[in-house]
Regions:
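A glycine- and Lys/Arg-enriched "phosphate-lid" helix/loop adjacent to the NTP-binding pocket
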Residues: 243-312
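Classical nucleotidyltransferase
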Residues: 44-46, 58-153, 157
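Conserved lysine of the Walker
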Residues: 164
């Protein structure tokens, strides 16, 4: 239970001020094991999403460009933050921090009482530096809204009957994570009565959009890595094969969705008719495989060929490639 003063503290506004400095942040990223650098809007979004149901919490971004790096530059920083808070109408009477060394500095430069929160890191025994150095090792400490940013994506490509769907399912199981199924199959069933005979040019943007939504869902709930059954280059290749031209919306998604690892399965496994496949001859399979390679290269997409002709060897090779990407030791 809270006494009167504590109850007042519980309902008063809280202000989270996120500092950023392009030069400093770039250096931190380059010294990290992160695959991409978060932008200022990325970081703001994480905070806004995390605290969106706590209406008394306000999120701000404070530009620290040109200020001496921590722990120096207190005079310049404190003058800057005073001006910033005045502009935002922030009148704090408490500062919360986990850094013991900062408490006297806040009092000296800002004249504000400081409340230490878990200064010994007994509850949250992690630092930002540790996460930057090895995000996957400290995965459980990364906030839910932030995890998708660190997720690695693996796209499995190949022609018809190359074993993509089964392989993606097995990989997701072995890595205990999510996968994005090929949306085109669901679309054919839900919109075309289960038969591609009615497929036309105007369907490809809808197929691509649905697949993008599947991918986004898989990434959002992934455990470090998400597996994608078929990419947008494959969708574009089918469009070019059947309609004689490429689709600009599909191309836009090719440009937007870049995967960390693209695996191209060789078309050297037995072809199995399932009612939705029509490129079963050796000539058709070879032509489509060549088209995939051509379009991958045109779009400057690096890929790894998996040429093993039996499913078990193919699976083990893919596991090896994913582990290498994740930085795991054999």
């Amino acid at each position: 239970l809270c006494d009167r003063r504590q109850r007042q503290l519980c309902i008063r506004d809280r202000h989270i001020i996120m500092g950023f400095d392009d030069t400093r942040d770039r250096a931190l990223f380059e010294d990290s094991a992160m695959s991409q650098q978060p932008t200022v809007p990325d970081r703001l979004r994480w905070l806004l999403q995390t605290f969106k149901y706590q209406k008394n919490i306000r999120i701000h971004a404070f530009n620290e460009e040109g200020m001496e790096p921590y722990p120096h530059g207190w005079d310049v920083w404190s003058n800057g933050i005073k001006k910033f808070m005045a502009e935002k109408g922030i009148q704090p009477d408490l500062i919360y921090t986990s850094e013991e060394a900062d408490a006297p500095q806040y009092m000296e430069h800002l004249g504000i009482e400081t409340v230490l929160v878990d200064p010994k890191r007994t509850f949250m025994s992690i630092s930002g530096a540790q996460i930057r150095e090895n995000p996957f090792r400290y995965w459980e400490y990364i906030p839910t809204e932030v995890k998708p940013f660190f997720v690695r994506t693996v796209a499995i490509l190949g022609g018809e009957s190359s074993g993509k769907s089964t392989l993606v399912n097995k990989l997701a199981n072995i890595f205990n994570t999510t996968s994005a199924w090929e949306y085109g199959r669901d679309y054919v069933f839900s919109h075309l009565g289960g038969d591609e005979i009615a497929l036309q040019y105007s369907d490809y943007d809808k197929i691509a959009l649905g697949h993008a939504q599947y991918i986004d869902f898989a990434v959002k709930y992934a455990n470090k890595v998400a597996f994608i059954d078929t990419d947008f280059v494959t969708t574009q290749a089918f469009c070019k094969k059947y309609e004689g031209r490429e689709h600009p919306f599909v191309q836009a998604l090719i440009d937007e969705y870049r995967f960390d690892l693209v695996i191209l399965l060789e078309n050297n496994t037995p072809w199995v008719a399932d009612g939705l496949r029509s490129l079963g001859s050796s000539v058709d399979r070879k032509e489509f495989q060549n088209l995939l390679v051509e379009m991958l290269e045109e779009n400057n997409i690096e890929f790894v060929r998996v040429e093993e002709d039996d499913y078990d060897s193919r699976f083990l090779r893919c596991v090896e490639l994913v582990r290498e990407m994740m930085g795991e030791q054999r």
